[in-house]
Amino acid sequence: MSIEIRAFAPADEDAVVALWHEAGLTRPWNDPRADIRRKLSVQPELFLVAVEGGSVVGSVMAGYDGHRGWLYYLATAGTHRGRGVGTALVAEAERLLEAMGCPKVQLMVRPDNAGARGFYDALGYEPFETWATGKRLIVDGPGGPPPAR
């Protein structure tokens, strides 16, 4: 069977959330369904899934703010790792971003995720010195820090 890369459809939600859980991408304070709802309101064409035989086997969210592009939630089903699914998803996200005029794409990887770091290295992504910071404005679930005010 071949892998199809296409835009996320609402019927994909349960499968995508399960995929993110399997891949260890979810956190208790970050409701994945809320992330999906928010993404569908902003550049939904940059939310992609990989499908084989009617089943979702991969996903990636991308975004472009006019300055930089970002990749989020890249995940591949364990049964499909090492088969080019993640590479195909990144390539399509990059193609769409470039078509929008995006000059550079960035992403964040947890420091202990050596597998992801090696994957992105192989795709030509280079680490750079920066201090990544964040400020939570909305808490989606229990266990997270309260919103900063």
Regions found by a protein language model. Name each.
Residues 78, 107-116, 134-139:
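Conserved beta-strand-loop-alpha-helix junction that forms the acyl-donor binding cleft
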Residues 82-95, 118, 122:
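Conserved acetyl-CoA-binding loop-helix of GNAT-fold acetyltransferases
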Residues 97-109:
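Conserved GNAT acetyl-CoA-binding A-motif
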